[in-house]
Design a protein with these regions (language model features):
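Terminal substrate-recognition subdomain of acyl/acetyltransferases
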Residues: 1-11, 97-178
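A conserved beta-strand-loop-helix scaffold within acyl/acetyltransferase catalytic domains
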Residues: 11-36, 41-64, 69
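Short amphipathic alpha-helical segments and helix-helix/interface helices
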Residues: 20-22, 85, 125
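A generic structural signal for short coil/turn motifs at secondary-structure boundaries
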Residues: 53-56, 75, 109-112
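Hydrophobic, well-ordered secondary-structure scaffolds
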Residues: 65-66, 87-92, 101
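Conserved acetyl-CoA-binding loop-helix of GNAT-fold acetyltransferases
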Residues: 71, 77-93
Length: 178
């Protein structure tokens, strides 16, 4: 399989293909692909948080990151992204997990979509809400560096309260109470 040339929001297509292979090799790694023939035209990835990021600090086996969602330009507008993300959450597959995604405006295709940063954020929030993900507050400096950046989270119905509390401690480093 090859990557569509327009799948370059996070890295060059060949490098992104290598990253997908690496994620597929992770025990917790999950990838949903959209393809036409042998060409990948969209993908969604799930994996544990990078060990260099704050989200890994809690050492939580039930915390997984929706790391990326991308659809090639010419395939946008057909609901492919929404269908991929809904498939990932179908049939209670992630009810035992806290799933989070960090939305940073610098990864968004503002130029290609001709959307403002706020309209793009609304579009991303709508997409994430289609699987029950909602905005969560955090004091993470990268997220707080721009008001359009955000943390979206879905807490599965089978996640224990102790994990939710641990996630809250990771979300807020600067608070003693929340």
């Amino acid at each position: 399989m090859t990557m569509h040339a327009a799948l370059d929001a996070f890295r060059r297509p060949r490098e992104q293909h290598e990253a997908l292979i690496e994620i597929a090799g992770l025990e917790e790694g999950r990838i949903i692909l959209a393809r036409e023939g042998d060409k990948i035209v969209g993908y969604v990835t799930f994996h544990y948080p990078d060990e260099l990021e704050r989200w890994s600090e809690g050492g939580m086996p039930d915390l997984i990151e929706l790391g990326a969602i991308e659809v090639a330009d010419e395939y946008r507008g057909y609901g492919i992204g929404k269908r991929m993300i809904q498939l990932a959450f179908a049939e209670g597959q992630l009810e035992n997990m806290i799933v989070f995604t960090t939305e940073y405006y610098w990864h968004w295709d503002l130029e290609g979509t001709k959307l403002t940063v706020w309209d793009y954020r609304k579009m991303m929030e709508k997409l994430m809400k289609s699987v029950g993900m909602v905005w969560f507050a955090t004091d993470d400096p990268e997220i707080c560096s721009h008001p359009a950046n955000c943390l979206m989270v879905r807490i599965g119905q089978e996640v224990p309260l102790s994990s939710v509390e641990q996630f809250d401690r990771v979300r807020f480093r600067q608070r003693f109470m929340y």
